[in-house]
């Protein structure tokens, strides 16, 4: 008799880290609605008067994503609060106030949330109640989204150090020598972390002790989270270049320059590359989302948005979803770059969507967090 087949694996029921996991390559789950994009609910946060900007600064999850589990959405806001909302209707479950804006994606690990912000602290919060378990002080702002592996928390700081803390009590396990200010996040593959710096370096670090395995020159400030794919490391920088390096030794394989754009940003890239099926997908300040071949960096297609693209574009079930600085959310076909649906939801979307069960969670600069389908 035929052996009974094991039940099919359940799709993941959470997006717990920035870009899904420590390797930054789980982008979410469908299924997608057959209808055009529509707002299911929105939640309004408060603003903060402009310490970084002349205008009052609002907005959520810049430049990260919310994190989402089976029932709740967690995100940090420019108003200095960490929020937990009911994913179904956007109602407030709890809020935790810090001393300054929060930019990074909160990391969900078990019953804990790891959050970090511009007040120099890393916070460990009980995700069910919103109460503080511990906090750890760094030397400067922490925009980098953390990752937790085997009860160790890893993150890079704008103070130039890469840190490893104990999840239980926040005790320091190690911090590296000063590498350069890290505003972007990192990805983990094969026991190593890959992270770019403001100085224009790409580091490959040994996670066990933080030692440098190799360093490659990008040559410009990089806020991108590197993507590791089939023995190569992909990243981008504010000079408008997308780079591909050898994962083993950091040798440059190719680079591609996005052209055009206006203002001081021109074609600069703040987004992170999404590498799937032999293709690299990334948006630029010139308003285009590019699809490049992963092996040679040649353009497959490009899509013109309504404004600059600073957020990253997760790819789920054949669709890329991303916002632009004109306030539009776009859903396009990853196959050929053709628009499926777009909707103006806010003013200035710097953030990246989290996608779970075909629902899209994204923050905008108007201080609102949106759920769309």
Regions found by a protein language model. Give the residues of each.
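Blade/loop signatures of beta-propeller domains
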Residues: 5-47
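Extracytoplasmic beta-rich repeat domains
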Residues: 9-12, 42-67, 94-109, 118, ...
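Short glycine/acidic-enriched loop and turn motifs that connect beta-strands
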Residues: 22-24, 81, 121, 161, ...
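Beta-propeller domains
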Residues: 78-87
């Amino acid at each position: 008799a035929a052996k009974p087949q094991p039940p099919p694996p359940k799709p993941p029921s959470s997006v717990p880290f920035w870009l899904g996991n420590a390797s930054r390559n789980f982008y979410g789950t469908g299924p997608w609605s057959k209808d055009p994009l529509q707002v299911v609910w929105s939640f309004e946060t408060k603003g903060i008067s402009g310490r970084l900007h002349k205008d009052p600064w609002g907005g959520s999850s810049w430049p990260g994503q919310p994190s989402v589990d089976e029932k709740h959405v967690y995100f940090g806001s420019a108003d200095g609060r960490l929020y937990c909302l009911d994913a179904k209707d956007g109602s407030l479950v709890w809020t935790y106030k810090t001393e300054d804006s929060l930019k990074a994606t909160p990391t969900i690990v078990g019953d804990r949330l790891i959050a970090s912000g511009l007040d120099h602290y890393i916070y460990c919060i009980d995700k069910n109640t919103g109460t503080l378990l511990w906090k750890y002080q760094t030397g400067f702002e922490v925009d980098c989204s953390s990752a937790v592996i085997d009860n160790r928390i890893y993150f890079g700081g704008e103070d130039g150090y890469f840190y490893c803390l104990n999840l239980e009590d926040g005790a320091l396990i190690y911090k590296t020598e000063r590498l350069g200010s890290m505003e972007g996040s990192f990805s983990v593959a094969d026991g190593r972390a890959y992270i770019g710096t403001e100085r224009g370096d790409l580091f490959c670090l040994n996670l066990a002790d933080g030692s440098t395995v190799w360093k490659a020159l990008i040559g410009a400030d990089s806020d991108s989270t590197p993507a590791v794919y089939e023995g190569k490391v992909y990243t981008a920088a504010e000079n408008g270049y997308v780079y591909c390096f050898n994962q083993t030794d950091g040798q440059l394989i190719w680079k591609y320059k996005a052209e055009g754009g206006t203002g001081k940003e021109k074609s600069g890239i703040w987004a992170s590359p999404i590498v799937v099926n032999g293709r690299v997908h990334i948006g630029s300040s010139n308003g285009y989302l590019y699809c490049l071949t992963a092996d040679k960096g040649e353009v497959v297609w490009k899509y013109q948005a309504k404004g600059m693209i600073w957020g990253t574009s997760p790819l789920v079930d054949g669709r890329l979803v991303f916002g632009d600085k004109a306030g539009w959310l776009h859903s396009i076909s990853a196959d050929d770059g053709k628009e499926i649906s777009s909707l103006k939801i806010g003013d200035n979307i710097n953030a990246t969507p989290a996608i779970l069960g075909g629902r899209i969670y994204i923050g905008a600069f108007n201080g609102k967090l949106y759920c769309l389908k």
